[in-house]
Structure formats: C-alpha cells, structure tokens
C-alpha cells in the first residue's frame, strides 16, 4: 500500500480536506519563532538529503512546529493570492510549489511516526491537530482570489509557452481546487468547511480506536497445549508477547489488520481458532472502541459533501479524476469476474469440506476452518508443507538477495547500509541508494517488524519528496508488520510476506526513481488506481526462477531450495485464488456500496448493510467474509482509499499485462528494466497515467494477464 501522508501535498497546497487552520497574524508567527528557536523541525535538517535527525526530534517539538508551519504557510498563500501583478506560472503555481516548507517538513515526520511508532503523546497531538489541519486546507482551497489566479492560468495554459510538465501541473492544480470546492458559493463553502472538519475529526478518532482495538482484542491462551500446530518459535513469541502484556505464564495471539489470521492455518484447536476469528471479525462492533457509528456517519457526511460539489454520491466524486472514471466501470470490471471467482471459490470450499470429512471432522466448513484445512488440501494436492519451505525464507536474505538483487538486475541500482543515520526505532535500518554510475539517488528506511504503536498492514511513505525545482532527493520508508523472532533466532517470513516486501519496494522505487521538476507531480503522486501498478508489478519478480534461486536458500546451510520443493511452491501459486480474490472483491464492493449512498440516505446498520451489499453482488459465501469488514476497514474509512479499494485490482490488470509483456522482452534484464524505469517510475504524475503506460507497453492493457496471474482463466 502507498501511504500518502498529507505532508507530501502541503507544500503545493493540493490537499482536499485533511489539512488545517491557524492564525494569520504576523505577530503570532514572530512570537512562535521566538519561543521555538531550539526546535529542530524549524530548520531543514543538515543530514544528507534533509533526512530527519531523529536523534534530536522529540514529541513536544511537533505541535509548535505544525502550528508555526501553518501560520507561515498561510501567510505565503495570502501573498500569492493578493499579488497585484497579473497571474503568471512563476508568481502563482511555482510560488505555491515552493510554499509551506516548514509545514511539509514537520508533518512528514509527524504523520509517519503516528502510523509507525505512535504513543499517547503523539496521538493526543494528532487529535488536537486534525480539525486545525482540515481548516488550514480549506483556507487555501476555498480562497477565491487564489483560485481566480489558478483559473486564469488554466484557461490560457496552452498559450503560455510552457513545458508539457508545467501544463500538466496547472491542470492538476485546477482539478483539485475545483474538487475541493473552490467555485462554490460562500454559503456552500461554510457548509463544506463544517463537513471537512467533522470528517477530519472522525477519521482521526477511527484511527485511534483501531490502534486501541489491536491491543484490546488480542487473544489470551492459558496453556501451551492449546497451541498445538504452532512452531516452537511461534509459541515462544506468544509467551513473550503475553509477558509483555502482563499475562505471565500465558500466551498471547495478536490480531492482524485483516479478517483472516495467519495463525489459523496452523492451529489444531478448533475452539481456539473460532475465538481468534471472532475476535478479528467482530472488532469495532461494540464496546468503548466501537467504530460502527463512525462508519455510518462517515459514509453519510461524504455523500453530503459530494452533493455540495455537484456529484451524485461520494464514489462518483472520488472516481472522477481516476483512470476508472466512474463507479459503473468498477462494477463492470468486478461483475465480469464474479462468475469465475465464485466458481473457483465453491470448488475450493468443496475440496476443503471433503478434507474435513476425510479427517474425521463432523461439522460444516466455517470461516475459522478455511485456512487450516486449506493447508491440508494444499499439502495433499501439491505435497507442499508450509513449514518445509519456511527455512528457505529468512528475512535478511529475502531482503538483500531477493528484493535488492532484483533492483540491481532490472534497474542497475544498489542499496548500501547507512548505520550512521539516526533512526526512530532500533528495528529501523537506513540505506543509501546508488545508480549504476555510482551517483547517489536517495535514502531508504526499512521498518519491517511489528511492534506496539504501529498500525497494522504495510505501506510506503516519504520523509522528503523529489523535486528538481527545489533540488531535493527522495527520502522514503517501507513499513511492514513482520513478526520478529525472539533474540538470537532467525526471522522467517511467509511467501505472502515475501511478495509484500517486493510490493512495498515497488512503491519505494516509484518514489526513489522520480525525476520531475515539480514536487506535486513527483513519485507516487498519481491516481489511486495507478499507484498500485508499480508495486504489484514488482511482486511478480519474487517468483522469477533466477530471483528465487538467489534468495531461497536454507538459513543454516546456504543450500538452495530443492528444485522439487520449488516447483511445488510455484505450482501451488494459484491455489486458493478463489478465496483470495473473492475476499478482496467483497471488501472492494462493500467500500463502493458505502460510498454510493445518496446524501439523503439515513444512517445504516453496519452488519445489515454489509450483508445486503454482498448479496447484491453475488458474493455472500458465509465461509469467505470480506478481507476487511467495515468496522476495521482502515483503507476505506480513516485512510485515503474511500471508494478506491478497487484500485488494487485495477492496478493489477496493468501490472499483469506489463509483466507478461516484459517476459516477451527477455524477462529479467537491464534493457527492459530501464525502459520501465524511465517510462513509468521516473515520470511520476508529469504524464497522464494511461499515456505513460502506453509509452512503455505500446498499447492499452487487457485482462488476460490478470486472469492468468490468478489462475482463473480456465474457469471462464
């Protein structure tokens, strides 16, 4: 997942409702400066590429830096908006690109840490700042004088003698200001400000509750015997987690961010499997940290906001600037796949039920049984035991000999450790990226291990964005939640985690390879349904024979994974794809249905709404619930993927088509890798996404590659 923190857009004032307000008083600005001279966030870091100096940044620095940043930024915006000179590209658009340096710097660090290394102090600041940041965004986006200048330039954009990238930037600004409400009446602007403030407050509260829920719903297990099926390493980790949580002598199973839980594939105790699954699936429905009420209200207020802006619903509003363009296009894409996906899923369910019956189970398949018995089916069908593969996927080897190796083979880049650079947690490692000619390109932070204070999932984000205009090079981070082994033991990753490591590096290189002039167009600043293309494309290299042979080696002997075992692993790649695809589609369509509500629709009962949405689309298979239920659907509600979770599959169509094309061009080689790097990853949003894709591929994508990738084509 690409995590687009608001800091990336602040300098360009291209945010659409998640920034905030501050005083416009010059005296206030001067007073804040006088008081905060010892705050390291007030000046650009002197470390390479302005990498944040985490050794001196403290929690108490953030709030004053954010408030001063907003004050300075707003003064800069007023200067631009009230400039008596006629609007030009330089005195308006370029000036906006250069504005908000302090706010960008402070917020990029702050919002990265609230996601990956949060604590009560940071969460308190986050709650206080949310409505202020929303107001600040509105103060910019709804400024009539500022929009008049942008509108004037937009109308004359093709007559100004500008570069194609500069014209593209004007178009991006204009569209985002329109979609933020810049051309609304004064009365409508008052209403949209109120809705933006409420949305900001609710999404922040949603995130905070999800973080608290992660700790609250962890399952305490009394005896080791109940954990039969887990490895000794996993049991030791569960014991250590329990001790850290104050449950000495017991075991703790932490719940991940998805409905399905990895531990369910190994646990033999059916009653415990049910406890764990229900803890996951029922989170947020009730209790002090319930999120159901937030889901209903967020869907409602987003519909109200869309109506103010002249759209039928939030989904229509959100998709207008995307590649998909309309909700109907998304429904059509999924609808065309439902028959194949359901057919695969029903066959998988029948195979699993047969395995339950064969092994003496006298019960019908339930959601908490799927993964446990699916693993048995996998072993029988492919003679593949997940534990037999495990010793060949040691974390460091996967990262260095898999992910980093692929980057060098395809794109000519290398990453070297930078232990001298400060990090925000001992588990984080810093690297410097070098191009084939030895020139330095970027700083990369690797934050792969789960810990308290980190939200669930995996994502990429930026501390510093690339820009020729400002002379900045990228500083990016990849974040995951891999379970770290106890001290002194190697950390192993599942094959799913292997592909996620490749996926997030796809986002990372999208940021680090960026070569554009303007920061607002850099790297991952593309549409939601294009941003997942580079990352999904990168996933497929994890299974490339040459790449696998380089990293899939036994952690003790260094011997490569036996060819027989490797072939079993590769052949099993399409196993359970009905389940995997259906649970994703279910979540994506529930997201789309929530955000297709009309503005006059009443508040919805979450469970009833979900059930009706799944039934409507023919995905109501009880043993296969959505990957995320609404109450913990971070992408769609507190995150930036509302009415956009479909984007993963839309992007996968591009990725599968592109990867198939690459194989016709020799596969893993520098020539095709550099073509892809230059036409896709270096250009950011300086070129329209489909135009960039056709520059690489020579044509628009088809769905054939996707169906082959997921092993679904044979069922059509």
Please name every model-derived segment.
Residues 23-25:
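Bacterial signal peptide processing site
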Residues 29-61, 68, 250-252, 380-382, ...:
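C-terminal, non-catalytic "cap/extension" segments appended to globular domains
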Residues 483-502:
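Short pre-active-site segment immediately N-terminal to the catalytic Zn-binding motif
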Residues 165, 169-170, 201, 208, ...:
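Active-site-proximal, well-structured secondary-structure segments within enzyme catalytic domains
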């Amino acid at each position: 997942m690409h995590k687009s923190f608001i800091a990336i857009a602040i300098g360009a004032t291209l945010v659409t409702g998640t920034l905030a307000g501050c005083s416009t008083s010059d005296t206030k600005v001067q007073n804040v400066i006088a008081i905060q001279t010892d705050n390291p966030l007030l000046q650009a870091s002197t470390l390479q590429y302005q990498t944040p100096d985490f050794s001196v940044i403290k929690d108490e620095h953030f709030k004053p830096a954010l408030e001063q940043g907003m004050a300075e930024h707003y003064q800069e915006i007023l200067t631009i908006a009230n400039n008596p000179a006629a609007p030009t590209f330089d005195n308006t658009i370029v000036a906006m690109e250069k504005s908000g340096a302090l706010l960008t710097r402070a917020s990029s660090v702050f919002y990265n840490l609230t996601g990956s290394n949060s604590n009560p102090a940071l969460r308190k600041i986050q709650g206080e700042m949310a409505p202020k940041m929303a107001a600040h965004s509105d103060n910019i986006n709804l400024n009539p004088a500022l929009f008049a200048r942008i509108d004037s330039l937009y109308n004359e954009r093709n007559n100004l003698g500008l570069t194609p990238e500069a014209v593209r930037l004007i178009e991006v600004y204009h569209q985002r200001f329109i979609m933020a409400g810049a051309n609304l009446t004064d009365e409508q602007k008052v209403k949209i400000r109120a809705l933006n403030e409420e949305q900001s407050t609710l999404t922040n509260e949603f995130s905070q509750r999800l973080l608290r829920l992660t700790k609250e719903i962890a399952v305490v297990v009394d005896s080791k015997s109940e954990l039969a099926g887990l490895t000794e390493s996993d049991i030791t980790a569960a014991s250590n987690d329990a001790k850290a949580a104050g449950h000495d002598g017991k075991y703790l199973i932490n719940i991940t961010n998805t409905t399905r839980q990895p531990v369910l594939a190994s646990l033999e105790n059916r009653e415990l499997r049910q406890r764990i699954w229900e803890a996951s699936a029922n989170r947020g429905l009730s209790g002090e940290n319930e999120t159901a009420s937030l889901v209903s209200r967020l869907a409602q207020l987003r519909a109200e906001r869309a109506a103010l802006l002249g759209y039928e619903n939030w989904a229509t509003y959100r998709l207008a600037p995307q590649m998909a363009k309309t909700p109907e296009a998304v429904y059509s894409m999924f609808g065309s796949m439902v028959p194949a996906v359901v057919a695969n899923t029903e066959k998988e369910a029948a195979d699993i039920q047969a395995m339950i019956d064969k092994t003496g189970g006298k019960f019908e398949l339930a959601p908490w049984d799927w993964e446990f018995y699916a693993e048995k089916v996998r072993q029988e069908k492919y003679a593949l035991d997940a534990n037999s593969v495990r010793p060949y996927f040691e974390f460091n080897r996967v990262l260095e000999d898999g992910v980093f190796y692929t980057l060098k083979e395809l794109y000519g880049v290398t990453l070297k450790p930078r232990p001298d650079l400060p990090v925000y947690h001992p588990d984080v490692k810093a690297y410097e990226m070098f191009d084939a000619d030895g020139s330095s390109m970027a700083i990369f932070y690797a934050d792969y291990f789960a810990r308290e204070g980190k939200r669930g999932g995996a994502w990429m984000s930026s501390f510093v964005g690339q820009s020729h205009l400002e002379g900045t090079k990228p500083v990016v981070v990849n974040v995951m939640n891999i379970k770290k082994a106890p001290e002194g033991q190697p950390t192993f990753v599942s094959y799913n985690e292997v592909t996620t490591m490749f996926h997030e590096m796809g986002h990372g290189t999208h940021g680090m390879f960026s070569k554009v002039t303007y920061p607002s167009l850099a790297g991952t600043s593309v549409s939601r349904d294009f941003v997942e293309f580079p990352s999904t494309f990168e996933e497929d290299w994890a299974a490339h024979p040459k790449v696998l042979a380089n990293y899939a080696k036994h952690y003790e002997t260094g011997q490569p994974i036996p060819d027989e075992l490797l072939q079993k692993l590769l052949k099993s790649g399409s196993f359970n794809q009905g389940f995997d695809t259906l649970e994703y589609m279910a979540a994506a369509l529930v997201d789309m249905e929530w955000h297709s509500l009309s503005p006059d629709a009443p508040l919805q009962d979450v469970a009833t709404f979900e059930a009706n949405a799944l039934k409507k689309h023919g995905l109501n298979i009880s043993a296969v619930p959505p990957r995320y239920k609404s109450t913990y659907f971070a992408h769609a509600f507190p995150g930036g993927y509302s009415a956009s979770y479909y984007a993963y599959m839309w992007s996968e169509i591009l990725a599968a088509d592109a990867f198939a094309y690459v194989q016709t061009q020799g596969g893993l080689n520098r020539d095709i890798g550099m073509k892809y790097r230059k036409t896709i990853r270096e250009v950011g949003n300086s070129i329209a996404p489909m135009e960039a894709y056709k520059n690489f591929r020579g044509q628009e994508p088809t769905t054939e590659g996707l169906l082959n990738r997921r092993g679904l084509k044979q069922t059509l």
